C-alpha cells in the first residue's frame, strides 16, 4: 500500500488538519472513535493510505500533530475527532513561538525537533511502502513557518527519496494577522524552494472571496475556509484511496507538474463550488465542471491565472463519468484558451479519474495549476519584506534568537530569483527556442 503520513504543525496547520481528518473519516465511514460503519468494500480497500489498523479493529490516523503551545492541541483533542489520534502523536511545547520564525526554526522549535522526528520515524516504520509526507502549515506565523520548514528539512534529510507535499497558507494581500508576516513568509519560501516537492499555495483572501461571492456565506468562519482546503486535500489523494480509471499519486503528480525543480508552487481549485443550500438543485455536467474548475474565481490563491500562463496543470475528476467526455472537455479548454498555456510544453494537462465522488455530490473535480501568475503572490510578499527590511524594522526579534542578517538577504534574493524564473518562462515561446538553436549552429 502507498501510505501517506500527515504532519500538521502550528495553529493553522492543526486546524486544517483536524478538518481534513473529519472529511477523510467521513469518506471512509469511520466514526469519531475510529470504528468503521460503512457498507462498501471500497471504503476499506485502501484505507491504509491514511490509517493504521490498531487492535480491536480501530483505525488510527497516520497523523503527527505538532505545536509550540498547548492551546490548539487541546481544542483538537476536545474537537469532534479528537479521540481518534494516537495520544503519543501530540507533541507540543509550552512557550509558543510568538509569531517569530527564528524561535520556531532555531530555538524553541529546534529543542522539540528530536521528539517530533521520533514520532515521524515511528509512523514511517509502520508503513509497508511509504509514498510520502504531507505537511499542513501557514507561512505567516512562527511555529508553522519556522518549525514547519525545520521539520521539512529534517524529513528531507532522512527520507530523501520520498515525496513531500506541503499545503501552505500564504499571507493574503488585504487580510494580515501579524506585522512580521512578510519576514516569516519569505524565510519559509526560501526553505520550501529547496526542500519541498510540491507546494499548494492557498491564501485566506482567496478563500474568503470564494466563501462570500460563490458560496454566498454572509460571515465566513475559519471553519468554512478550512473546509475548502480539506476538499482540495482530499481530492489530491483520492486516486490513492479509491479505485479509478486513471490513477494519480503524489509522485505521478510531481513528475507531471514540475517542469523545473524550483517551480513547484501550485494554485489549487475545486469544483463544484455551490452554496450549501442550492446543492441538491443542480446536476453538473463534465463540461460545467471543467469550465468552473479553470475559472479564476475558483482559485484558492489570490492570483489571476489570466495574468500568466499554465506551464502544467492537473485535473482530478471524481464520480461516474465517461472517459471520452472528460478527454473532450480537457482538449476543448486547452484549444479555446491556448494562449494561456505554454506552447513549448505540448499536452501539459494531466487528467485522473476516480469513480467515488465525495459525500453529497454526484461528481467533483480538483484542479491543480502550475501557473506563472503565482509570481504575483511572491512579489507582493517581497515588496512588503523589502519595505520593512530596508529600515531593519523588527529585526532585533530575529537576531536576538541567533539569526544573521545575511539569512534575510539570502531569502530575499532567492524569492526574487523565483519570481524572475517564473517571468522568464511566462515570456518564453516555442519559436524563440528554435531560433536559438539555429544561432548556435551558425556560431559553431
UniProtKB/Swiss-Prot annotation:
GO molecular function, one term: metal ion binding
Location(s), subcellular: Cytoplasm, Cytoskeleton; Cytoplasm, Cytoskeleton, Spindle
In-chain residues carrying the UniProt-annotated modification Phosphoserine: 172
Hydrolase is among the record's keywords: no
One biological process term in Gene Ontology: mitotic cell cycle
Protein name: Tubulin beta-8 chain
Originating gene: TUBB8
Summary of the tissues where the protein is detected: Expressed at a high level in oocytes, at different stages of development.
Function: Tubulin is the major constituent of microtubules, a cylinder consisting of laterally associated linear protofilaments composed of alpha- and beta-tubulin heterodimers. Microtubules grow by the addition of GTP-tubulin dimers to the microtubule end, where a stabilizing cap forms. Below the cap, tubulin dimers are in GDP-bound state, owing to GTPase activity of alpha-tubulin. TUBB8 has a key role in meiotic spindle assembly and oocyte maturation.
Amino acid at each position: 500500500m502507498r501510505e501517506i503520513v500527515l504532519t500538521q504543525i502550528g495553529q493553522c496547520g492543526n486546524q486544517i488538519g483536524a478538518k481534513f481528518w473529519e472529511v477523510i473519516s467521513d469518506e471512509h465511514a469511520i466514526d469519531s472513535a475510529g470504528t468503521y460503519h460503512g457498507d462498501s468494500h471500497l471504503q476499506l480497500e485502501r484505507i491504509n493510505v491514511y490509517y493504521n489498523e490498531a487492535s480491536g479493529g480501530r483505525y488510527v490516523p497516520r497523523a503527527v500533530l505538532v505545536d509550540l503551545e498547548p492551546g490548539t492541541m487541546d481544542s483538537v483533542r476536545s474537537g469532534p475527532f479528537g479521540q481518534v489520534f494516537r495520544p503519543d502523536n501530540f507533541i507540543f511545547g509550552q512557550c509558543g513561538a510568538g509569531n517569530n520564525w527564528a524561535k520556531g526554526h532555531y530555538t524553541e522549535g529546534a529543542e522539540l525537533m528530536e521528539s517530533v522526528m521520533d514520532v515521524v520515524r515511528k509512523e514511517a516504520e509502520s508503513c509497508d511502502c511509504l509514498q510520502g509526507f504531507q505537511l499542513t502549515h501557514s507561512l505567516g506565523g512562527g511555529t508553522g513557518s519556522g518549525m514547519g520548514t525545520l521539520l521539512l528539512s529534517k524529513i528531507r534529510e532522512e527520507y530523501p527519496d520520498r515525496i513531500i507535499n506541503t499545503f501552505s497558507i500564504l499571507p493574503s494581500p488585504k487580510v494580515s494577522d501579524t506585522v512580521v508576516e512578510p519576514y516569516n513568509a519569505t524565510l519559509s519560501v526560501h526553505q520550501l524552494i529547496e526542500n519541498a516537492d510540491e507546494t499548494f499555495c492557498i491564501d485566506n483572501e482567496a478563500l474568503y472571496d470564494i466563501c462570500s461571492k460563490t458560496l454566498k456565506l454572509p460571515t465566513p468562519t475559519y471553519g468554512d475556509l478550512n473546509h475548502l482546503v480539506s476538499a482540495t486535500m482530499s481530492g489530491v489523494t483520492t486516486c490513492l484511496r479509491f479505485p479509478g480509471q486513471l490513477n494519480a499519486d503524489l509522485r505521478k503528480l510531481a513528475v507531471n507538474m514540475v517542469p523545473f525543480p524550483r517551480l513547484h508552487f501550485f494554485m489549487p481549485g475545486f469544483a463544484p463550488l455551490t452554496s450549501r443550500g442550492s446543492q441538491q438543485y443542480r446536476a453538473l455536467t463534465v463540461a460545467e465542471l471543467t469550465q468552473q474548475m479553470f475559472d479564476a474565481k475558483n482559485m484558492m490563491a489570490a492570483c489571476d491565472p489570466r495574468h500568466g500562463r499554465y506551464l502544467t496543470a492537473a485535473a482530478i475528476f471524481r464520480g461516474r463519468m465517461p472517459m471520452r467526455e472528460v478527454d473532450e472537455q480537457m482538449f476543448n479548454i486547452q484549444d479555446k484558451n491556448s494562449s494561456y498555456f505554454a506552447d513549448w510544453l505540448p499536452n501539459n494537462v494531466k487528467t485522473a479519474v476516480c469513480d467515488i465522488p465525495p459525500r453529497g455530490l454526484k461528481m467533483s473535480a480538483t484542479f491543480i495549476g502550475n501557473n506563472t501568475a503565482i509570481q504575483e503572490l511572491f512579489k507582493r510578499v517581497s515588496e512588503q519584506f523589502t519595505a520593512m527590511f530596508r529600515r531593519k524594522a523588527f529585526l532585533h526579534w530575529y537576531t536576538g534568537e541567533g539569526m544573521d542578517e545575511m539569512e534575510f538577504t539570502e531569502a530575499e534574493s532567492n524569492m526574487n530569483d523565483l519570481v524572475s524564473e517564473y517571468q522568464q518562462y511566462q515570456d518564453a515561446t516555442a519559436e524563440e527556442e528554435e531560433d536559438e538553436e539555429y544561432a548556435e549552429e551558425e556560431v559553431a
